[in-house]
Design a protein with these regions (language model features):
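Glycine-rich phosphate-binding loops of nucleotide-dependent enzymes
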Residues: 1-329
Length: 329
């Protein structure tokens, strides 16, 4: 279109996209035009700073504390997908207190099913799951919530929030049964509204009113509200699936900060993401899934895109297992 003499206006928060296509770039923040610059005179880091209003540090932030005991132990787990195919095959992993474990892998290699199992949404055929010293026998969402597992799902509006309801109702989903939120089966309306307002303020959720349907919020504010609910429940383990998908630079930085704060407070974080930059930036340990198994493990300091990519493609780990099986046979 440009070569035909037409003018193209591209609106996006994806920095790689704008750097690959635009001739001039204008940055908007909070409804105002902040800056306009030729693409040849800028870079992604400067654009990120203009979008957020401050410097965005992309380097990995290591934990300042020693990791604690194993909080989650998964051994020889076998899970079938909806259509009957084996989604997890003899999967084993551990997540310790005070660490972020990032799981990388091409979509469709069992990440979805793993997250569902850990949140009580899917049952398993074989294997064991030990959480906080107790073996989990059957899948139950309520049991996993009460045990201390928080969940940020891949699709926040499909599985995490009720779009037609406001902040108050969405924040109550996990805690409405507790004595703080209800009494004799009736919600503590006044107290719950005050509590909701405090969480909206604490997590910097931008909304006209706590009763405004969350579907009218931006994606970043929806995600902050979801994190507010999950973190307020004081979880031991956070299972975060593609937590920054569709978010702009500022909202992404905010989500990353929340995850690292959980880790630094001694909580465990299991991060499932297809964004390798995100996995590399946040993870203390990196695991790679392929064909329903963990085929690679490395520390956050040792991990690099090339090695992870080879594992994701099945070029490492998987062939070694096949060779070992052939020798044993």
């Amino acid at each position: 279109m440009k070569n035909e003499g037409k003018t193209v206006i591209l609106t996006t928060h994806k920095l790689k996209e704008v750097m690959a296509t635009a001739d001039r770039i204008s940055v908007m923040r909070k409804g105002r035009m902040i800056h306009t610059i030729d693409r040849s005179e800028t870079n992604e880091r400067e654009l990120a700073r203009l979008m957020v209003g401050k410097e965005v540090a992309p380097e990995r932030k290591a934990s300042a504390r020693t990791r604690g005991r194993p909080l989650l132990k998964v051994e020889a787990l076998e899970v079938h997908a909806d259509h009957g195919r084996k989604a997890l095959d003899d999967l084993e992993l551990q997540v310790h207190e005070g660490e972020i474990v990032g799981i990388a892998g091409v979509a469709g290699n069992g990440q979805k099913e793993l997250a569902e199992v850990l949140n009580g949404l899917r049952s398993w055929k074989k294997g064991s799951i030990v959480f906080n010293g107790q073996e989990i026998k059957t899948a139950s969402v309520r049991h996993m919530i009460e045990a201390g597992v928080a969940h940020v799902p891949e699709n926040r509006m499909k599985s995490g929030l009720a779009g037609g309801l406001g902040a108050v109702d969405n924040l109550l989903f996990k805690s409405y049964r507790t004595d703080k939120r209800s009494r004799f089966g009736f919600l503590r309306t006044s107290g719950n509204r005050d509590w909701s307002k405090s969480l909206v303020e604490k997590f910097d959720v931008k909304t006209p009113d706590i009763d405004t349907p969350v579907q009218q919020m931006s994606g970043g504010n929806q995600q902050k509200l979801l994190f507010a609910r999950e973190i307020d429940h004081d979880p031991l383990l956070m299972v975060a699936v593609h937590p920054t998908q569709g978010l702009d630079v500022g909202a992404t930085e905010g989500v990353h900060r929340l995850l690292t704060e959980l880790r630094d407070a001694g909580r465990a974080v299991l991060l499932l993401s297809e964004d390798l930059d995100e996995v590399l930036q946040l993870s203390d340990r990196v695991l790679v899934m392929y064909n329903g198994r963990i085929v690679g493990e490395m520390s956050g300091d040792e991990a690099d895109r090339e090695t992870i990519g080879m594992y994701m493609a099945g070029m490492y780990g998987h062939e070694d297992e096949k060779l070992a099986e052939e020798v044993a046979g």
